Amino acid sequence: MDEYFLPEVMMSAKCMQAALGTLKPLIVAEKGEDIGTVVIGTVQGDLHDIGKKIVGMMFEAAGFTVVDLGVSVPPEDFIAAIRKHKPKIVGFSALLTTTMNMQWETLKVIKA
């Protein structure tokens, strides 16, 4: 079994963040006609956002306007963004299993 040490994981995350900053202008350069809005964010209690950023870039490249709420977003902020931006798609991400309850809570608030 392979072993990974926390400093290596942290360094690889920093490298990925830097790579995303370099790649984003290239990926979204060919953006077509605006086809709607997407609201995305990482649920409250979770600070991981590399996957969310990649998904956001793909939506932008496909022609969507992306409203990224950031990390550790409370359900109320999702509701405020939905009311303000009237998105076609809402996406929320999480990596930690400890935030599973918050994922359900966010979904309940959005569906209400």
Where are these regions (language model features)?
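Domain-level signal for soluble alpha/beta catalytic cores
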Residues: 1-112
